[in-house]
Amino acid sequence: MFKILKKMFDNEYKELYRFSKLADQIDALDEEMSKLSDKKLASYTDKFKKRLEDGETLEDILVEAFAVAREAAYRCVGMKPFYCQLLGGLAIHYGNIAEMKTGEGKTLTCVLPAYLNALTGKGVHIVTVNEFLSTRDSEWMGSIFRFLGLSVGLNLRELSFKEKQDAYNCDILYSTNNELGFDYLRDNMVVKRENRVQRPLNYCIVDEVDSILIDEARTPLIISGGVMQSANLYTDADRFVKSLKENEDYIMDEKSKAVSLTDEGSRKAEEHFHLDNLYNINNTALVHHINQALKANYAMSLDVDYVVQDGEVVIVDQFTGRLMKGRAFSDGLHQAIEAKEGVKIQQETKTLATITFQNYFRMYHKLSGMTGTAKTEEEEFRNIYNMFVIQIPTNKPVIREDATDLLYPGKEGKYNAIVREIERRHADGQPVLVGTIAIETSELLSKMLTKKKIPHEVLNAKNHVREAEIIAHAGEKGAVTIATNMAGRGTDIKLGEGVKELGGLCVIGSERHESRRIDNQLRGRSGRQGDPGFTQFFVSFEDELLVRFGSDRYRGMLANLGFTGDQAIQNKMFSKTVESAQRKVEGNNFDIRKQLLNYDDVMNNQREIIYAKRNEILDNESIHDTVLNGFRDYISDIVNSHLVESTKLKEEDYSEILEAANENLLRKYRINLSEINGKHPDEVIDTIYNNVTRDYEEKLEDIPEEVRDEFEKAVSLRVIDNYWMEHISTMSHLRDGIGLRGYANTSPLQAYTMEGYQLFDEMIARINKDISIYLLKSEIRQNLERKQVAKKAITNDSKDHAKVQKKSTRVGRNDPCPCGSGKKYKNCCGK
């Protein structure tokens, strides 16, 4: 009965059933395709494109296109996709995640849906986790696409914008996720449309989709610029923090890794820095530096979170174990770590543009992916990306043995046991792969193996340059490899001669990861394509995962039972403790990512509006009509700011409106009070607008239209970019402090949303105001680059604007508020 219900309601079963019917049709064409000449087979591409132009859909040509790509793969790379790979390709084409075990040929599988979707001419992006894999796959799998007459591009970090344009214009593009995101941000900072590199985002296939869309979802992509900040602040804060004692001067939450001063710590800070009150508003910057120094010294660990290489602090990717050169911790944390380690303190940066992977990849018209481990995170993929996880059957049954965890009271006993197990298996010639979470663990085990004179290789962030070479030999007889956090993912470990008879590859986990999915990735390195294999995790109650989630009770039980450091226990109750801890962390991390997305959605909506505004400016030959409409909007804001309490203008309002218009907008055709006095607000707006446009058009009459258009675009882009960068910083500060609203029984997210949109509306009003003022008060010089014109326009206006401010040292109650809100002072900051 249960099986019948499962078949009726299980989406995955129904999808696989549908895919199998299509796969049967594709398979039936195999003999027909194999008889075609190379020229005849390749000619199908043009035929498919013609059919699509004539109104057929991808669904109409799917079976034939898959069959053509399958045969082309066999002729170009000597591999014909198996039946299970056809199922995987279909799952990917329909916007799902294909979960395929290690060694099942994901790289070849994605060729089938990529070929089909590339026939539309709108572009297909195949995303990998690093440039090594992008380069390898673009050459290896790229030969199939080229054989079929499609163009293949490779997007690398060092390419010029022209080379990137050529790559993005190809039918198939191989790229890393980072480079795609940064190109998108850079495209929305250009001042000429011909400098953009990306086309509209059509279809994307993400390899190792769990790593990119889940593990890296909390890390935003940031393009930043330098800001001046004294290094002394970092060194002073670091010196003070190093003098503090845990639980007396500061406390650290093991679960969240949050570090904060106690009352005693605050008192010592006031004494150290000679302050009356540390939390006075004037000491905000100092408090920020102290908090970052606390985090740097007590929550961030050398060789775990970062390494020091050539006198620089380099971030370690927590999910791959690779170094992230060119990336920096934000908000001054990177500089705090540099002060901690005694290396040169780099200039702090200011965010110029930012986006999360979550929001970037959701912009694609169609998104799909593939990985060996995604089922445990299906809820997240479904809720955030609208993708289902389809588990693809293996080509051959998995015969790998996954042993129950061995639990030890302490780390020392656990490490000794791991070394003994390696020694025993190495003596038999069986290859061993040891997975560690931290660099320091890999180096500790390496030292222990060296003492035992066991030859081995270490693969971590410090020697990642030999990654491919080390992984290539990891399955050979007698090989011992220690890898940090699955460095080497994306490259299969193939068994050497005689290894199958020894039991295949032995995988040892030195501790459980926070996520069961990462553990499954480590297990998946063994037993590929029906090979034998063995996996086992060695766990201690001193491991970080169990320390954070209450292992003290169980450690006490082991002690009472008489278990010593080197004695292991295999018990379902203890194994459930580990799994329970992992589920808690996974749930917590999912909540964090959902919360991050909720907050980022606020910024994302605002980002889309700003970027749409920029693109409108770049894509139109002329924005002159838009500029004139902007003048009217700004004049309306001036007049409407005097209508807060009434629908009619008062006598003093007319004088204030007149002064604002004459000072900020008009040059030659200034207005007299008699021209607007007593008129309806709409008539006042029309009168000022007519004079403003007359003034502006007269200024432009000797200027060629193309120069005028260039000038208007330059000023508009510069103003928008300046305010947007400032707004990013403002929203970041709002986000940092919004959590405190919870103490006032207010939803922090709701408060952030409402206040964020209020700030955004005010920014839009200021953008409109400044564009109007700059254009009306600036002189136009011909034959200047757009950037130079914009900078000059802004510089000139800044001086003029300063003069206006100097006219009155006292702000009147009915004056426009200096904060730029557009309201009267008495109804804004003068309350």
Which stretches of residues belong to each language-model region?
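Active-site-adjacent structural elements in folded domains
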Residues: 110, 418, 802-804, 812
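Short Cys/His-rich zinc-binding micro-motifs
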Residues: 807-826, 830
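Hydrophobic, well-ordered secondary-structure elements that form the walls
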Residues: 434, 482, 724, 760, ...
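Generic detector of short, well-ordered, non-transmembrane alpha-helical segments enriched
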Residues: 377, 430, 478, 606, ...
